[in-house]
């Protein structure tokens, strides 16, 4: 591997802006904002709009859209099924 071409991988804190949920993970992204984590160390803070704490798939508040297709509309129009 060539030296100096790979991004710097470090620990950062991600914060869900909708719920305020924070988690520590590794990333190559940096930030000017920092936050003190539970272990007492200071890490860069990256704000995200959606995470597993607020995404409907993970929270169980998922809504399923039911769209009638052409066949369903045909059957409904002509009284079939």
Swiss-Prot record:
Keywords: Ribonucleoprotein, Ribosomal protein. InterPro entries: Ribosomal_bL28/bL31-like_sf, Ribosomal_bL31, Ribosomal_bL31_B, Ribosomal_bL31_sf. It comes from the Bacteria. Gene3D superfamilies: Ribosomal protein L31 (4.10.830.30). GO terms for biological process: translation. Pfam families: Ribosomal_L31. One of its GO terms (molecular function) is structural constituent of ribosome. One of its GO terms (cellular component) is ribosome. Part of the 50S ribosomal subunit. NCBIfam families: L31, PRK01678.1. HAMAP family: Ribosomal_bL31_2 (MF_00502). Belongs to the bacterial ribosomal protein bL31 family. Type B subfamily. This is Large ribosomal subunit protein bL31B. The lineage of its organism: Bacteria, Bacillati, Bacillota, Bacilli, Bacillales.
């Amino acid at each position: 591997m060539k030296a100096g071409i790979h991004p710097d991988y470090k620990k950062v804190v991600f914060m869900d802006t909708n719920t305020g949920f924070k988690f520590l993970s590794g990333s190559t992204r940096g930030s000017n904002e920092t936050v003190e984590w539970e272990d007492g160390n200071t890490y860069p803070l990256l704000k995200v709009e959606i995470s597993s704490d607020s995404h409907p798939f993970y929270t169980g508040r998922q809504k399923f859209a039911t769209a009638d297709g052409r066949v369903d509309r045909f059957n409904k129009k002509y009284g079939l099924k």
